[in-house]
Amino acid sequence: MSLFESVRSQMPAEIPSQLERMDAFWTSYRQSNQEIAKVVQTTSEKLGGKDFDAIICGGTLGIFIACALQRRGWRVAIIEKGILRGRAQEWNISRKELNAFLELDLLTEAELETAIATIYNPARVGFQGGKDLWVRDILNIGVDPVYLLEVLKQKFLDAGGILLEKTAFKQAIAYADGVAVEVALT
């Protein structure tokens, strides 16, 4: 078994097909065969009533801002093409960045500590043929994204946020007083 086959066999079932789709997209894009769809229209007409103060496309990173806004009284919806969940690979971050979750009252101390999977110091930064640089407290904390996103997702929903999973963004129309968003089930 080749190294590629070995690594691929250890991936969750959906990952190889997702990687193949992304690779095909970027190959087509590099060859200038990728048509860029116009997805935002504008009009001077008025929309009238609004259902949300903010609509966020993409939940994996969008959940952070969505949860913060929703918990501050905004009416927020998230449009997520798949299911909003973290991947099985840790995210690296610094303590200073993590503290933003506490400052924004998105996580409790206990939740933050539970989200931390690994802490290490120092870290080596280097490039082939160059001199290694050892740094402390820079991207030295591994966070469990499965846990982190699930906690934020529940807090968002508990605060009244709307999560549209398996829903893709199609287009937006910018009116004089708001934006209408069209979606499609995936």
Q: What label would you give each PLM region?
A:
Residues 165-180:
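A conserved short coil-to-beta-strand element within the FAD-binding core of flavoproteins
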Residues 1-53:
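Extreme N-terminal leader/targeting segments of oxidoreductases
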Residues 83-124:
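N-terminal FAD cofactor-binding segment of flavoenzymes
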Residues 55, 59, 64-90:
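Glycine-rich FAD pyrophosphate-binding loop
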